[in-house]
Amino acid sequence: MSIFIGGAWPYANGSLHLGHIASLLPGDILARYYRAKGENVLYVSGSDCNGTPIAIRAKQEGVTAKEIANKYHEEFQRCFRNLGFTYDCYTRTDSEHHHKTVQKVFLRLLEEGHIYKKTVEQAYCETCTQFLPDRYVEGICPHCHEAARGDQCDACSAILDPLDLLEKKCKLCGSAPSVQETEHFYFALHTFQEQIKVAVETAKQTGTWRDNAIQLTERYVKEGLLDRAVSRDLPIGVPIPVEGYEDKKIYVWIEAVTGYYSASKHWAEKTGKDDQEFWDREAKTYYVHGKDNIPFHSIIWPAVLLGIGEGTIPRHIVSNEYLTVEKRKLSTSKNWAVWVPDILERYDPDSIRYFLTVNAPENRDTDFSWREFIYSHNSELLGAYGNFVNRTLKFIEKYYGGIVPKGSIDVELKDKIEGLYKHVGEAIEQTKFKVALEAIFDAVRFANKYFDERQPWKEREDDPVSCEETIYNCVYLIANFVNLLEPFLPFSSERVRNTLSIVKRNWEPQNTLPNRIDSVQPLFERIDVKQIECEIEKLYGAVK
């Protein structure tokens, strides 16, 4: 089976925070799981280096947009690598290959009659003497009356036209813009109304889109899909490939989602492999992002794919809700966030991955609390999983000289593990990652109980053969926990694999156990709970 996984592209205008990772982590879990199953996986993403936010940041700092994009693209790559993300291709939207692919898609849509020219009114700043890109216009959302940008309202997820805003002002100078006529290209989105309606109805029946994606898309379909501008007067971006319009850029809402396609083509070019299988109707596709990106993946991108004749529109939309920080809405402008480069300096990446999975905002907003983060590490990773692995392997090291005793796999344990693979696999495929991880940790707690009840420290003296059976079965459990947890906790899984000399990584019960173990080291270190206050003080102290 061909599995395509697309992770949303973060804007390269500032550091990643845990809200980004909470929405993107499911992509890596899926990729690792499907690779272990032996499926053909293509997992792509990249840095959005063309957006208006980058141009604004560059102007504020007095540097070029390229310098800003380079800085954060490189930082993103380090963060994703240090968190264990296994992208097959992580690229950027200001690359030549991306520009060429986007321009080809634009021309194909133009040839097929899905793009047309239209004279429209656009916000113009007399002070800055320029037409204002949508994100350069700020004001009040006409739907929910919250503060909003000219392209979208974060509060109610409405896609906006900047002229719809109330109390409009230029983001650069703060003055009220005038309205002038200009010519732009438009995408005939209304012509895909019925196909999008069928797609959302199918997703509703099969449960392959998150509820928030279904509800929001149904709302747009009910209201009627409106044609959208595909060109803008932007300072940076992909030039319109039509004579006389080269100064205009392809609007980021269509250009950025086409990044999945350009990354796929770039991967094929670099590896010499054919990527068409990932765009065929039979391919299984997952698009992983936050709820603010829903309409771009449930409406815009499917319409673009249909418009260029590709068979596979998004089958699974994994659109997480928002992550709050200490019960407050995350705010980058106020510096109320937990920044990824910072937390990675002091904490195990598996601790971050664990917390953001068991507390994932899959169906509702969830909160990142330093207290909960540190206690979950100490009680679950260290106290449950790390404890079981350490006590078993230390027992072997102390009483068997590192040689794994011989035994036979207990039938009840074997059935339990086989059932666990099936249950966890189904949960991952259905994008229920929290359910999957909790099921594994239920089994870990069962394993600790098994160790306690068997009391190998007593069996060793009273019934040495039973003791060997107990320890053998504990190693059996560990070998399979490593396999089951690898999509979630890759770093600790790798450490245990090395200790047990386990090479196989396929998604099936591990029934062949190692003969000996290498030097046993603690899987996790206890985090001093005094760190809770330190981290909270640091968080509040950094607020702007």
UniProtKB/Swiss-Prot annotation:
- Cofactor binding annotation: Binds 1 zinc ion per subunit.
User: Which residues bind Zn(2+) per the record?
Assistant: C141, C144, C153, C156
Motif range for 'KMSKS' region? 329-333
Q: What is its EC number?
A: 6.1.1.10
The record ties this protein, via CDD domains, to: Anticodon_Ia_Met, MetRS_core
What are the GO cellular component annotations? cytosol
Catalysed conversion reaction: tRNA(Met) + L-methionine + ATP = L-methionyl-tRNA(Met) + AMP + diphosphate
User: Which UniProt keywords are given for this protein, alphabetically ordered?
Assistant: Aminoacyl-tRNA synthetase, ATP-binding, Cytoplasm, Ligase, Metal-binding, Nucleotide-binding, Protein biosynthesis, Zinc
- UniProt superkingdom: Bacteria
- Function in brief: Is required not only for elongation of protein synthesis but also for the initiation of all mRNA translation through initiator tRNA(fMet) aminoacylation.
Name-wise, this protein is: Methionine--tRNA ligase 1
Organism of this sequence: Bacillus cereus (strain ATCC 10987 / NRS 248)
